[in-house]
Amino acid sequence: MSFQQRFARALDVGYKNFLSKDAVRNIFAYDNHLRGLVQKECKIHQTPYRVPSDLMVQSASDPARANLFNYSSQLVNHDFFFSGLISPERPSADADLGAINLKPGIDASFGSFGELKSQMVDVGNSVFGDGWLWLVYSPEKSLFSLLCTYNASNAFLWGTGFPKFRTNAIVPLLCVNLWQYAYLDDYGLNGKKMYITKWWDMINWTVVNNRFQATRIESL
């Protein structure tokens, strides 16, 4: 499902108490702008246009294509962030069901879901500058942990997301956008902490659990 298809409803109504429709439209416009920049960079470097994840991997270790990496990586981050939210038309209770399966691992890693929330809010709020905060899982250690990446970088290139960089170190399960454009419209310059707190209430734990279960299947 494309970014446009997934968020057609959100463009009209926003994300409940998390993001207004105006904020969603601004993020959507920025996403489209990035797609235009990706196409431009592909022409400059005579690179066949592919999905952002492929372009990100291809350009990650090439300084001459740093712009292509940044633009495509940010698109990957956008998609992962929004796909982890409860859709506007879906009851929140349905999206909480996945938390049941995650609870034993979360409790072992953080103490409780409440402590995970507290750490994500505090760590995310303390990030200086633009970036992303990730919940990741280590199949080797059977532990969940937090990871901060800055600017357009992401957790996929640290872990199992793409074969070229496969290390089995970590698997991204969830992320929150910490760039100012994500929260400035609705929360203001000093509203990042409230933005992250509201985001927590919009997490689709069923999606997160599906990502987690996929790592367990791969390890068999």
Swiss-Prot record:
It comes from the Eukaryota. Disulfide bonds: none annotated. Coiled coil: none annotated. Signal peptide: none annotated. Gene3D superfamilies: Iron/manganese superoxide dismutase, C-terminal domain. InterPro entries: Mn/Fe_SOD_C, Mn/Fe_SOD_N_sf, SOD_C_sf. GO terms for cellular component: cytoplasm; cytosol; mitochondrial small ribosomal subunit; nucleus. Keywords: Mitochondrion, Ribonucleoprotein, Ribosomal protein. GO terms for molecular function: metal ion binding; structural constituent of ribosome; superoxide dismutase activity. It holds the Pfam family Sod_Fe_C. GO terms for biological process: mitochondrial translation; removal of superoxide radicals. It is found in: Mitochondrion. Its main location: mitochondrion. Component of the mitochondrial ribosome (mitoribosome), a dedicated translation machinery responsible for the synthesis of mitochondrial genome-encoded proteins, including at least some of the essential transmembrane subunits of the mitochondrial respiratory chain. The mitoribosomes are attached to the mitochondrial inner membrane and translation products are cotranslationally integrated into the membrane. Component of the mitochondrial small ribosomal subunit (mt-SSU). Mature yeast 74S mitochondrial ribosomes consist of a small (37S) and a large (54S) subunit. The 37S small subunit contains a 15S ribosomal RNA (15S mt-rRNA) and at least 32 different proteins. The 54S large subunit contains a 21S rRNA (21S mt-rRNA) and at least 45 different proteins. mS43 forms a dimer with mS42, building a large protuberance adjacent to the mRNA channel exit in the mt-SSU body. Belongs to the mitochondrion-specific ribosomal protein mS42 family. This is Small ribosomal subunit protein mS42. It comes from Schizosaccharomyces pombe (strain 972 / ATCC 24843) (Fission yeast).
